[in-house]
């Protein structure tokens, strides 16, 4: 019985790994064959706007929401599609990037996304917030079946403009691998740090090291 149980677990792991590989290959094939994929971005400021422009330059369709009219104009001029609010358009995105400035806006965004997203959709939270804030957002998305990855970035707005960012990604590895090829369009390097929250922990350590160095 013990052997049979272990065999069953191993088979499930293999099946899960194969599915992840297929998902990743599908994205790579779409990119290679010029199939237009869509990424949604919430927040089109200095960082989110840079993500959008670099993704568009890589042939990825970008839909974005930002209440700032100048941000909407920027996205239009870059070749993207600005949206007037959260909506069904988010359900067609391969991934959704959050580039948000405050905990309140993050909480509001997560609440709205929970009412729209399909099970299994991947959301990247790229800001620097407390672990408690990130965990609360993750719990809410878990409850509606979507997946949140903790993906803070290291770099300035100027570096973001030329895709010279380091991303510290954490969360379910299968979800990370599924969207990893898309990250190459707006980052220089992505470090997969393991379980959810490790990305932020790594970012905090990096920030502290910079602070100590500059003291």
Which residue ranges define each predicted feature?
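Low-complexity, intrinsically disordered or signal/transmembrane-proximal segments
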Residues: 1-6
């Amino acid at each position: 019985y013990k052997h049979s149980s272990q065999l069953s677990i191993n088979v499930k792991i293999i099946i899960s790994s194969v599915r992840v590989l297929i998902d990743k290959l599908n994205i790579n094939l779409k990119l290679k064959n010029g199939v237009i994929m869509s990424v949604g971005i919430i927040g089109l400021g200095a960082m989110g706007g840079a993500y959008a422009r670099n993704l568009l330059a890589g042939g990825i369709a970008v839909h974005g929401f930002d209440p700032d009219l100048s941000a909407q104009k920027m996205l239009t001029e870059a070749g993207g599609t600005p949206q007037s609010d959260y909506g069904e358009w988010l359900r067609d995105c391969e991934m959704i990037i959050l580039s948000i400035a405050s905990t309140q806006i993050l909480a509001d965004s997560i609440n709205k996304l929970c009412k729209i997203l399909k099970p299994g959709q991947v959301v990247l939270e790229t800001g620097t917030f407390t672990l408690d804030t990130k965990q609360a957002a993750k719990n809410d998305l878990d409850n509606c079946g979507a997946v949140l990855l903790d993906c803070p970035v290291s770099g300035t707005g100027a570096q973001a403009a030329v895709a010279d960012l380091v991303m510290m990604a954490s969360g379910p590895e299968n979800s990370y691998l599924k969207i990893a090829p898309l990250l190459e369009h707006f980052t220089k390097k992505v470090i997969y740090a393991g379980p959810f929250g490790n990305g932020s922990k790594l970012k905090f350590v990096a920030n502290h090291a910079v602070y100590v160095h500059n003291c």
